[in-house]
Amino acid sequence: MRSGVIAQKVGMTRIFTDAGEHVPVTVLKVESCQVVAHRTLDKNGYVAVQLGAGRRKPKNVTRAERGHFAVAQVEPKHKLAEFRVPEEALIPVGAEITADHFVVGQYVDVTGTTIGKGFAGGMKRHNFGGLRATHGVSISHRSIGSTGGRQDPGKTFKNKKMPGHMGDVTVTTQNLKVVMTDVERGLIAVEGAVPGHAGGWITVRDAVKKKLPAEAPKPGAFKLNGSEAAPAAEAVNEEGA
């Protein structure tokens, strides 16, 4: 299991394959996605890598956050996320993950926050059919109708589908195929739609239900600030010391 990445949704477009097939894709941008910290068994009880992406002005970051980023020697980040990984898959702190972390043809799971729709009725929120257009129905054509029984059970059960707030929830879309990667511009194009609005933050990880291609880099594709890349295991030992 490898670490995922934090990306930003650019928008949707389409591309054409060599065979002339039209493929709708969502473009994700991976920019300044760096390892901020490690989570170890000794200190935290689990193993994970914490990533940060996006740039923030130091004046807009709390003192505690500035200290956290200073320890990792990275600039303040806009978005933080953790990815559970085994110890051998840890990436050194300060390393920047690049777009070729994923290879063309592999499948990924994408997590984002859906677009908020505000208060919505039953027909829009749950695809209810509504009431009849005529035959005694007036005004309440889009009503949801009855919500329960009579004296027995004498109540409306919990989780009954009703009008209410729609959208603005965390959703994971599984098994999206990577169609293209552009390392220079930090772009990843995946087939299909991705939850959220343009500019929203997205986490991308290897698909759980699909096999990881053999050519996928392990523990990942990244570049270090220094001239030499230290093994991930050594980075864990240094942080745990």
Curated annotation (Swiss-Prot):
NCBIfam families: L3_bact (TIGR03625). This is Large ribosomal subunit protein uL3. Gene3D superfamilies: 3.30.160.810, Translation factors (2.40.30.10). Residues 140-168, 216-241 are annotated as: Disordered. InterPro entries: Ribosomal_uL3, Ribosomal_uL3_bac/org-type, Ribosomal_uL3_CS, Transl_B-barrel_sf. Belongs to the universal ribosomal protein uL3 family. Signal peptide: none annotated. GO terms for cellular component: cytosolic large ribosomal subunit. The keyword Membrane does not apply. Methylated by PrmB. One of the primary rRNA binding proteins, it binds directly near the 3'-end of the 23S rRNA, where it nucleates assembly of the 50S subunit. Keywords: Methylation, Ribonucleoprotein, Ribosomal protein, RNA-binding, rRNA-binding. One of its GO terms (biological process) is translation. GO terms for molecular function: rRNA binding; structural constituent of ribosome. It comes from Xanthobacter autotrophicus (strain ATCC BAA-1158 / Py2). It comes from the Bacteria. Part of the 50S ribosomal subunit. Forms a cluster with proteins L14 and L19.
